[in-house]
């Protein structure tokens, strides 16, 4: 019986400590914060991938525009040379 009373005392002390900790820190909010932190780090990775994809898409679009401008300039110079060489 002595062992059961010591278990009860230690159990109640343990529960009291838990209650005090949860009362001080807001036990449920602490769990929420830790889960939101892990989800925000996941979102950070996902946003990082999206940012990389957007950056690549922007660079491809820019290179395509540069290539189009260069092509138009070359065509213009060829036409200009052909027109002036004929005259």
From Swiss-Prot:
Q: What is its main location?
A: membrane
Pfam families recorded: DVL (PF08137)
Low complexity: which segments have biased composition?
29-41
Q: Locate the compositionally biased regions of type Basic and acidic residues.
A: 14-27
Region named Required for DVL/RTFL small polypeptide activity: 51-82
Q: Where is the composition biased (Polar residues)?
A: 1-11
Membrane topology, record value: Single-pass membrane protein
Q: Which GO terms describe its cellular component?
A: plasma membrane
Chain ranges passing through the membrane: 64-80
Which cysteines are cross-linked by disulfides? none
Q: Where in the cell is it found?
A: Cell membrane
The UniProt keyword set, sorted, is: Cell membrane, Developmental protein, Glycoprotein, Membrane, Transmembrane, Transmembrane helix
Q: Which residues are glycosylated?
A: 83
Single biological process term from Gene Ontology: negative regulation of cell population proliferation
Write out the ranges of the annotated region (Disordered).
Answer: 1-47
| InterPro entries linked to this entry | DVL, DVL_RTFL_regulatory
Q: Which family does it belong to?
A: Belongs to the DVL/RTFL small polypeptides family.
Q: What does this protein do?
A: Small polypeptide acting as a regulatory molecule which coordinates cellular responses required for differentiation, growth and development, probably by restricting polar cell proliferation in lateral organs and coordinating socket cell recruitment and differentiation at trichome sites.
Q: Can you name this protein? A: Small polypeptide DEVIL 11
């Amino acid at each position: 019986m002595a062992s059961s009373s010591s278990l009860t005392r230690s159990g109640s002390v343990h529960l009291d400590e838990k209650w005090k900790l949860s009362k001080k820190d807001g036990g449920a909010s602490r769990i929420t914060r830790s889960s939101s932190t892990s989800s925000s780090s996941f979102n950070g990775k996902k946003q990082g991938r999206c940012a990389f994809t957007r950056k690549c898409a922007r660079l491809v679009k820019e290179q395509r525009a540069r290539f189009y401008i260069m092509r138009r300039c070359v065509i213009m110079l060829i036409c200009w040379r052909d027109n002036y060489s004929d005259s």
